[in-house]
Amino acid sequence: MPPVTGDWLYKYRMLTEKVKNLNIDEKKFEQLFTPEVHSVADVLRKYGFDARVVGGAVRDFIRGQDPRDIDFATDADPSELIYMFNMEDIPHDDKGIGHGTVKAVFGGGKVDVTSIAYKLELKDGKIRAVTGQDWEQDAQDRDLTINSMSIDKDGVLYDYTGGLDDLRNQRVVMLPHTHDKITEDPHLIMRWFKALGYFDNPRWPKQDFEIIKRHMPLLAKIKGLEKTDRELSSIMRGKNGQKIIRMMCSAGADKYL
């Protein structure tokens, strides 16, 4: 599994990859945009807001896999979500509003809608609210380029970081802020190794792996043996699972897990 050398790739892709139209597999697309999600998206658009599926579900959809956890997001803030749902007589649950999430309740199910304009962030050991982000800022704030894409109900893929190109070329590339966030969230180390298992022949920037190795001692701070076991099991279930586990150990993970 050879690394990609240099950081020029990220800088170049930032300038070239913006908005793309996909040839949509209708059945797969219906798994992303269920009738309930369509209904919520229609309401948000009626009031001038955007609505997209974001993150890992988009990655899996492009890879032709069934998306598991579907994250549905909007640029409306939580108070605007509640206002719109009230105006349209949509039952909702606002217990998650502290995290920017409002749940729309339908007869056939529920849709969690999370605002990209409001989020909680851990910085220097303290939790603070971040407001006013747009779609591109939200994409830049994710961990990997392949997890930063979003897609709307019309099948338009929004790619601000070159994630589609990386996905097609089996590259696992950290977004710049992830280098700093690892100190606050060591789980990002496990997620990086897990992402290698999405591909038959993954590649990565050399500098990313150097950062991963340098932060290996932080794995000792991860609380909960059950969660660690879940992450390791997930890595083993991926492609080249044993090889990736050996790679983790050679980088020093076995000393801290």
Give the ranges of each region predicted by the language model.
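Extreme N-terminal basic, low-complexity initiation segments
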Residues: 2-5
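Catalytic cores of the polymerase beta-like nucleotidyltransferase superfamily
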Residues: 7-257
